[in-house]
Structures are given as C-alpha cells and as structure tokens.
Amino acid sequence: MLTRSKKYGGRIWLNDIDSRMAVHQASINLQGPAAMPTTDAIGEQVIEAVVAGPDGANRLFTIIGAANVCIEATRQQRTTETWTFLVGPPLTRLQFHRAIGTASIASQIVSVQTAPREFTVNIHSVEADWDDENQRVKVRVEIGVIANGTTVTVTQIRYSVAILAQM
C-alpha cells in the first residue's frame, strides 16, 4: 500500500496502515581532518509500501530527492570527493534490514577557457547504510571531476534510495 505525506510544523508525516513516523531533513556533522563533506537532502519524497520481505522485513521505503554539493576542477585538474547526507525515517538497528541507492548529476556549470577543451564528470560510487549515531540511513556519493581547458563545478545531485525495514 502506498502512502501520502502531509507537512506539519516542518516535518513530513507518513500515514500508512499501522504507523506514523516523522521524516525530517538533517545533516551529519563529521569532525576531524579526514571528514567528508556533508550536505542536507532537499525536496525529499518518501513512499512507504507494505511488503513480505526476507527475515521479517515488512516495509519498503522508496526515497527520492536532491542534495546540493560543490565540487570543482579547473584547467588541468582532477578532483574526487565523497559527499554524505541522511535520508528516510528514523529506524533502530533492529528495524533496518538493508538499503541501496543510486545517484546522478543534476546540475553542473562549465566555463570554457583554453584549447583543448574537455571535461568529465562521474559518479564513482553510491553507498547507503544505516548510521547508528543518527538512527537513519546515511548515503555516501563519490563524485569525480576532470577538467582540461575548462572550469567545471558540480552543484547538485539527484538520488534514489530504497530501504527495507521491519516495522
């Protein structure tokens, strides 16, 4: 069964057959010299379906949205960064079963400078897994940019994440 969402006080409430869960946007505060850049998920839309999954899993959350990022390469430069953000409803470790995700570049700016002029933008990897500190699914997206005679800035990605859970 699919659900509808309604906004109440900055939160989105999912109405389904037998539960109400608040879903809100949040970011991860990673600290230290090797911290990955973090961002907030924006425009998140969630569909919850009742399923008969493995090992008692009975819910499938499908989440789509965008995340603003800023990764840039100039002239003869290569840059790779891994961005992280949280998606979906709060879940305990016992409720969470598995998550998968995909991502694509949604917005980029290219400024042509000198010959030869070429650039490459890639999504190298997408990982989605439960984060025990935040009790939500953390998505990690590795983005690569190569510039040759251009300045390339990636400013937004779109994502889709599926979460299998037991409610």
Which functions belong to the PLM regions below?
Residues 2-167:
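Extracellular attachment/recognition segments
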